[in-house]
């Protein structure tokens, strides 16, 4: 049987600063992917009732999807990206690759729901670009997560997060023996 537990992390000040950099980088990457998808959507769609009989066709390109956008991650991690409107420099190499891949999955899911709709066929609204106040979560998963079962009075656990170190986690519910961390 699979269980899902959520615990509150209590990072130190240095860890909070690093996690804020991660969230900002993931927010930029999400918005960039969404912008690429909207650009594709605007260039490749044509309303049937408004199209003239003779019109030049623009160069069509492949539809961006999870895999096509994920393959750009190694190139982006090589050099820092500069945000055009703020001049901010973001270093993608500071964020674990699997976290950025989860951002790709998040953007793909939002755009697919917009195009295809849910099981009843009703389409959701156009996905929004996320501001810093709207993008406040990220998923850290993979082989780098280790659970150190040293608890202080049964109240705290320590989770080893890649590129950050040990993060203190409040243990409000006991983990079963042999528990494996996935995310």
Task: Label the predicted regions.
Residues 1-183:
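Nucleic-acid substrate recognition interfaces
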């Amino acid at each position: 049987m699979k269980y899902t537990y959520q615990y509150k992390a209590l990072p130190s000040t240095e860890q909070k600063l690093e996690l804020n950099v991660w969230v900002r980088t993931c927010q930029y990457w999400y918005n960039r992917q969404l912008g690429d998808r909207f650009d594709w959507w605007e260039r490749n769609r044509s309303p049937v009732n408004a199209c003239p009989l003779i019109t030049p066709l623009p160069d069509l390109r492949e539809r961006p999807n999870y895999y096509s956008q994920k393959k750009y991650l190694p190139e982006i991690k090589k050099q820092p990206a500069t945000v055009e409107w703020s001049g901010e420099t973001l270093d993608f190499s500071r964020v674990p690759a699997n976290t950025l891949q989860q951002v790709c999955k998040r953007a793909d899911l939002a755009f697919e729901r917009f195009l295809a709709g849910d099981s009843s066929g009703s389409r959701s609204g156009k996905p929004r670009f996320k501001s810093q106040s709207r993008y406040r979560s990220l998923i850290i998963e993979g082989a780098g997560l280790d659970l150190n079962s040293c608890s202080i009075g049964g109240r705290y656990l320590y989770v080893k997060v890649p590129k950050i170190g040990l993060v203190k986690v409040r243990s409000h519910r006991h983990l079963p023996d042999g528990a494996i961390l996935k995310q």
